[in-house]
Amino acid sequence: MSIDIDWERATSGPDGELLAERIRSFIHDKFQQMVLPRFIRSVQVTSFNFGTIPPELEIRDLTDPFPDFYEDGDEDLSVSSEEQSPMREQADRYRERIDSWQTNSPGSLEGQMSGRMGFGHPLQLAPDEDGSRLHPLRSPINLGDINPYLFPRSGTPGIPGGTSNLGYFMPLSGLSGSQVPLRAVTRGNPFSGGWPDSPLENEKRIGHGQGPPRRRSEVDVDAIQSRPSTANTGNTLLSRGSVSTGDPRHSHPSQTLLANNPGQVPDANDSPVSAVPPLSGTPPRRMREQKAEDFQVFCRTKYAGNISLSLTAEILLDYPMPSFVGLPLKLNITGLTFDAVAVLAYIRRRIHFCFLSPEDADALIGPETGAGGGDTMEPNSLRRKNLSLLRKIRVESEIGRKENGKQALKNVGKVEKFVLEQVRRIFEEEFVYPSFWTFLV
């Protein structure tokens, strides 16, 4: 089914001019972030115009929106209370559980001592005895971490208080063989390498240093995200990533201690941290609730119009010396040919818009058919995968000043090639799925 668009009404007037200015400013900002070649000093986008020729639109399918469109980002802070989804409530309960666990568990040395001694106020410790500043001593020999409290002042007959300073000063040569039993070194005693930090320090790190772990979907998934391939996905696109519930970074402190000490038997009088049940995995992504009125349209979009984009730059000449002189450049894009599948999803006062890559479009709505009914190109061919959505771009370039009605230089191929490659890259990175734009209506 074809759709007729009142192109003049949509692109003219104050609203059309404002939209054109926003597009010009957006492309200009992207060029400012690029690394320019050595022979180009700067690029400025001066104007943008929609032209007078409208695109051709043909509706190909009507489906449910992509799951990614339901993801609730950090910028959606004005969502009403009725749009709170069950998955968001589950994530909120998860964070409340972490906060409650950190509040009730003794996370510092002061909290433990004040709780055991029964004082109403926490015990004030000297700076040298502060739990946050107390670190295990390190030996030059790889004996692991040695806690100074393991070596109190030993008693000497006839001298009250003893004379040993081993608890305060560690000899540079480490411990002698008579002081470190061989069995202790081989069985993972605190003197051996790889001995974990004390449970007290682990609790302090958890209570004050780390806080609740960040969601996997916000950090790990986005860091390794690449455009999903949908060659064999049927009618749905691949999800952006999965959350692993067995991530060792999110394991419980008590489980980590027991794992490092297989022979240790948990004591009933241990810290309440060991009695807290492990948290069940990581919270899911924030997703808005799906409703029956949500819909998504696949639309074949063809355009061969006179859209225009004007850019100015300065080209540097290296003769007779590097960057000897700069020539002004004016580059005009006077039209382009475009063919792609657009996705338009409506979800409760939000419109999500993007284009599909050629292979994604073939997987979802089938390959494009020609006038004779056959496929215009093999769906999985290498040529189609490398085909850009911007099929053809018409460019006019003027370099140098006019002298006697003639240009000093014309149509420098390197400059045109660079600008066209950057225009294609901006379009594909910003408008092709999984990238999409959201508009509030």
From Swiss-Prot:
It is a peripheral membrane protein. The SMP-LTD domain is a barrel-like domain that can bind various types of glycerophospholipids in its interior and mediate their transfer between two adjacent bilayers. InterPro entries: Mdm12 (IPR027532), MMM1_dom (IPR019411), SMP_LBD (IPR031468). Residues 68-89, 183-289 are annotated as: Disordered. Pfam families: MMM1. It is found in: Mitochondrion outer membrane; Endoplasmic reticulum membrane. Residues 226-245, 253-263 have a biased composition (Polar residues). GO terms for cellular component: endoplasmic reticulum membrane; ERMES complex. Belongs to the MDM12 family. It comes from Paracoccidioides lutzii (strain ATCC MYA-826 / Pb01). Component of the ER-mitochondria encounter structure (ERMES) or MDM complex, composed of MMM1, MDM10, MDM12 and MDM34. A MMM1 homodimer associates with one molecule of MDM12 on each side in a pairwise head-to-tail manner, and the SMP-LTD domains of MMM1 and MDM12 generate a continuous hydrophobic tunnel for phospholipid trafficking. Residues 1-441 form the SMP-LTD domain. CDD domains: SMP_Mdm12 (cd21672). The lineage of its organism: Eukaryota, Fungi, Dikarya, Ascomycota, Pezizomycotina. It comes from the Eukaryota. PANTHER family: MITOCHONDRIAL DISTRIBUTION AND MORPHOLOGY PROTEIN 12. Component of the ERMES/MDM complex, which serves as a molecular tether to connect the endoplasmic reticulum (ER) and mitochondria. Components of this complex are involved in the control of mitochondrial shape and protein biogenesis, and function in nonvesicular lipid trafficking between the ER and mitochondria. MDM12 is required for the interaction of the ER-resident membrane protein MMM1 and the outer mitochondrial membrane-resident beta-barrel protein MDM10. Keywords: Endoplasmic reticulum, Lipid transport, Lipid-binding, Membrane, Mitochondrion, Mitochondrion outer membrane, Transport. GO terms for biological process: mitochondrial genome maintenance; mitochondrion-endoplasmic reticulum membrane tethering; phospholipid transport; protein insertion into mitochondrial outer membrane. One of its GO terms (molecular function) is lipid binding. Disulfide bonds: none annotated. This is Mitochondrial distribution and morphology protein 12.
